[in-house]
Amino acid sequence: MEEFKRYLELDRSQQHDFVYPLIFQEYIYALAHDHGLNRSILLENTGYDNKSSLLIVKRLITQMYQRNHLIFCANDFNQNPFFGHNTNVYSQMVLEGFAVLVEIPFSLRLISSLKGKEIVKSHNLRSIHSIFPFLEDKFSHLNYVLDILIPHSIHLEVLVQTLRYWVKDVSSLHLLRFFLHEYRNWNSLITPKKSSFSFSKRNQRLVLFLYNSHVCEYESIFVFXRXQSSHLRSISSGTFLERIYFYGKIEHFVEVFTKDFKAILWLFKDPFMHYVRYQGKFLLASKGTSLLMNKWKYYLVNFWQCYFYMWSQPGRIHRNHLSNHSLDFLGYLSSVRLNPSIVRSQMLENSFLIGNAIKKYDPIVPIIPLMGSLSKAKFCNVLGHPISKPVWSDLSDSDIIDRFGRIYRNLSHYYSGSSKKMSLYRIKYILRLSCARTLARKHKSTVRAFLKRLGSGLLEEFFTEEEQVFSLTFPKASFTSRGLYRRRIWYLDIICINDLANH
């Protein structure tokens, strides 16, 4: 980072956060292309056609301001070289470079805040499965959870105002406004169910940065409350005095909110509040009562509407009791169930049976949604009956078997954390029979005749490596088939949810 800072010559302008002049520097676009300082890689790329030069960038900026961008029509929008499906090399360069520029103030502040601190680097925290051990440890002690969909109708000016606290460069903010107003369907980028993006895939870096910075703004209140309340377990006198001061600040903070909400919200005194977010959805769990969770729901709706001008319908926030409802989160149906156990106690000549119920976090495989995904991907019909995959009939037999087997192995790998993996047998049956029907269709034969001729060993790709994992992890233990499917394993190398539509 020091080399990066020196190369960008930010020392003279860092105090004002002036990043706009850097858009005329050619090496910015090399950074945007390969995330390094090697310009030769950029010039060797045929997609840029060896036209990356300072003169071209300056000429492009000049042409941008010579056009009148305040008047739009449908044809102009479709033909705009900056957006749409036009692969104009200059527009790609400017957008990629600007995405790097707006990240610079955040990166420099992060590096300066970490000086003198020893940071433990762990790539395992990038895994989606790293969330579930946390839920397993915490949720079994909690009562209620708010299942919340983050509002996605963000006003364009709100995004710009969010960056004003970090980037004081007015010219950069004007350029950001230009990009955002050119793209009039901005909200579809962050709507989970919409996939028709007008931005090029190369420019999603800017989109994700703006969205995450915006979410970080209203997410900070949870981080603040949790970071302060997490020290309550400490018993030192200094920490005790710090807690008194902290609660004094909270009471003052709540009194300030009284002016807007006409009620005192004693929400931030709950030391058992836990927060988890992934993409456009987050969970807020607490050991408190139903009344407390209703107050949180009321607070969030008003907070988004009053301070971020985002309309959030109360129906997007669901309050559930963990013992009675299942949460659809990260592809699992999670719940907290009571696990009864009976202990026999012997005292002299008398014996007693003591019943005890322990709360246990239980993630299960959502078999019905999975079958719906298989039906959408044309592996089975809506009733779950396997069908052939005609679009793969032109592939070789080994490629067909490998594709079907890879889909099942990925699903089995992702749902290894469930204690009820026996339900995956239905998915395995659908994929195996769909594979057999695809091969039979290719060879113009029936499934029975095809398998009889080649043998059942043809579909060995569908046998997972779970047994090998257990034998390596527990070499001295022996597991039955039933015990194998009840054991939970959380893998720390999964960085995305398996999408059946993109196999």
UniProtKB/Swiss-Prot annotation:
<dbReference type="InterPro" id="IPR024937">
    <property type="entry name" value="Domain_X"/>
</dbReference>
<keyword id="KW-0694">RNA-binding</keyword>
<dbReference type="Pfam" id="PF01348">
    <property type="entry name" value="Intron_maturas2"/>
</dbReference>
<dbReference type="GO" id="GO:0008033">
    <property type="term" value="P:tRNA processing"/>
</dbReference>
<dbReference type="InterPro" id="IPR002866">
    <property type="entry name" value="Maturase_MatK"/>
</dbReference>
<comment type="similarity">
    <text>Belongs to the intron maturase 2 family. MatK subfamily.</text>
</comment>
<comment type="function">
    <text>Usually encoded in the trnK tRNA gene intron. Probably assists in splicing its own and other chloroplast group II introns.</text>
</comment>
<dbReference type="GO" id="GO:0009507">
    <property type="term" value="C:chloroplast"/>
</dbReference>
<dbReference type="InterPro" id="IPR024942">
    <property type="entry name" value="Maturase_MatK_N"/>
</dbReference>
<keyword id="KW-0819">tRNA processing</keyword>
<dbReference type="Pfam" id="PF01824">
    <property type="entry name" value="MatK_N"/>
</dbReference>
<dbReference type="GO" id="GO:0008380">
    <property type="term" value="P:RNA splicing"/>
</dbReference>
<keyword id="KW-0150">Chloroplast</keyword>
<protein>
    <recommendedName>
        <fullName>Maturase K</fullName>
    </recommendedName>
</protein>
<keyword id="KW-0934">Plastid</keyword>
<dbReference type="GO" id="GO:0003723">
    <property type="term" value="F:RNA binding"/>
</dbReference>
<dbReference type="GO" id="GO:0006397">
    <property type="term" value="P:mRNA processing"/>
</dbReference>
<keyword id="KW-0507">mRNA processing</keyword>
